[in-house]
């Protein structure tokens, strides 16, 4: 005999299963996107200390998000935590080795520390994946100039300007090299 209590328990179980397998994942996805967007907006707005807090909060919940790690690494670089930035870029690369942005970001950190050969290696990797990546070409040109390889620097600045004609820094750097 089915009692009201049995029906109530069955409905409660159905509600719990629907919540666990349907509603909760949807809410989680929205929450994840909101956390990421908020941290990215704070970063873009130049509110770096707040952005770092938000990236930390995001990465506490989603520690295997390579894009989140790379973005937090960029914020860490801006606030002067170069080694922390390199750690984040290394983690991002280990999670998604085919994504090129963390290599560029790590190269910028290595330049800041005067680690020219490591920076050069990162930029060359990016160029091997995308020969028209003007950012990698420009940064590699900076490295070549830093080690007094002016002809190579000039050639790379020229390529960076060619692949992104609106990139005024590449043109002015080419003239100075």
Which residues are covered by each model-predicted region?
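Register position in tetratricopeptide repeats
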Residues: 44-45, 78, 112, 146-147
């Amino acid at each position: 005999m089915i009692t009201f209590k049995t029906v109530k328990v069955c409905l409660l179980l159905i509600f719990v299963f629907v919540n666990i397998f349907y509603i909760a994942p949807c809410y989680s996805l929205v929450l994840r996107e909101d956390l990421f967007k908020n941290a990215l907006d704070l970063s873009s707005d130049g509110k770096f200390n707040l952005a770092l807090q938000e990236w930390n909060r995001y990465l506490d919940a989603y520690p295997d998000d390579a894009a989140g790690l790379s973005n937090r690494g960029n914020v860490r670089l801006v606030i002067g935590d170069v080694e922390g930035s390199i750690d984040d870029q290394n983690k991002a690369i280990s999670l998604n080795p085919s994504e090129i942005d963390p290599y560029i970001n790590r190269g910028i950190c290595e330049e800041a520390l005067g680690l020219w050969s490591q920076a050069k290696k990162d930029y060359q990797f990016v160029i091997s994946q995308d020969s028209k990546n003007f950012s990698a070409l420009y940064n590699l040109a900076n490295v070549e100039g830093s080690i007094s390889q002016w002809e190579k620097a000039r050639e790379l600045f020229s390529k960076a300007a060619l692949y992104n004609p609106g990139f005024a820094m590449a043109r002015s750097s080419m003239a100075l090299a």
